[in-house]
């Protein structure tokens, strides 16, 4: 059982502070990898919460592999988001204030695979073709980066 799940058994839906990593993967066409999420039924960026004893880079590596099947040689920290930018209420009522560490995956290899049940689809999107229904936290990150998001060196 994950740390967050075991915590939720004790405190229920009350707001928590969670620390996690969100991963930006950019292909050679300057498109950003997004996942259609099974929990919120909208598009987001791969990522998740830290487990006890993990480093943030380990969180990024684990979540990238679990949610996309991709592996990365290393991760570059882009920015940290917190406060109201990290607030989210899940459809089940769970509330969280995330301390979100946005990383770009570097030296990415492997094939896109959905095995964890969290992703219903994985797709790369250009700046001009972003999906209409983007999850709040992902939209906040994309808005904060603006054009810089799509001007970064690719991840492969």
Predicted regions and their residues:
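Acidic, metal-coordinating catalytic segment for phosphate/diphosphate chemistry
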Residues: 1-22
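Short connector loops at helix/strand junctions that flank enzyme active sites
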Residues: 18, 38-40, 45, 72, ...
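Short, well-ordered beta-strand micro-motif
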Residues: 25, 102-106, 123-126
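Conserved Nudix-box catalytic region and its N-terminal flanking loop in Nudix hydrolases
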Residues: 27-67
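Nudix hydrolase/Nudix homology domain
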Residues: 41-42, 112-156
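A short coil-to-beta-strand element that immediately follows conserved catalytic motifs
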Residues: 71-81
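Active-site-adjacent beta-strand/loop module that shapes the phosphate/pyrophosphate-binding cleft
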Residues: 81-111
